[in-house]
Design a protein with these regions (language model features):
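Amphipathic alpha-helical dimerization/coiled-coil segments
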Residues: 86-112
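Beta-hairpin "wing" of winged helix-turn-helix
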Residues: 57-75, 80
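Accessory beta->alpha helical hairpin/"wing" motif in late/C-terminal subdomains of nucleic-acid enzymes
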Residues: 81-85
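Basic amphipathic alpha-helical segments that dock to polyanions
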Residues: 49-56
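Short, contiguous hydrophobic alpha-helices characteristic of membrane insertion segments
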Residues: 4-6, 60, 111-112
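N-terminal helix-turn-helix DNA-binding core of bacterial DNA-binding proteins
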Residues: 5-48
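Short beta-strand/turn micro-motifs at beta-sheet edges
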Residues: 2-5, 66-68
């Protein structure tokens, strides 16, 4: 796995929770939203996203429900963040901010 892939993998759960904190979404919608918002930097495949979503559900950070079929379209599975998921997201964002700060300090030679 490349350095870039390792970095991306480390933040995907946080990014998915951030999307769900804004609104309930189905999988393909998350993939497209993340791709557009990151200007094609985060391009996920379903095989990457769905294990994250399943893990979020298993840990009660997200829950899912099926939409009603519309105009002959198949129902979609929507995911939404839970209260526990919002707490997890806040925790991750706080640690991400500290992590980013410390890495930046070290790279600039300002570390102790």
């Amino acid at each position: 796995m490349s350095f870039e892939q390792q970095l991306k993998k480390g933040v995907l759960e946080m990014l998915v929770l951030e999307l769900l904190a804004k609104k309930s979404m189905y999988g393909y919608e998350m993939i497209q939203t993340l791709k557009a918002a990151s200007e094609d930097f985060f391009v996920l495949k379903e095989g990457t996203l769905y294990p994250i979503l399943y893990r979020l559900e298993d840990n009660d950070f997200a829950k899912s429900s099926w939409s009603e079929p519309k105009d002959g379209q198949a129902p979609k599975k929507y995911y939404e963040i839970t209260k526990k998921g919002r707490e997890r997201l806040l925790f991750q964002k706080e640690h991400w901010t500290l992590f980013e700060k410390k890495v930046d300090e070290l790279l600039r030679g300002n570390g102790k």
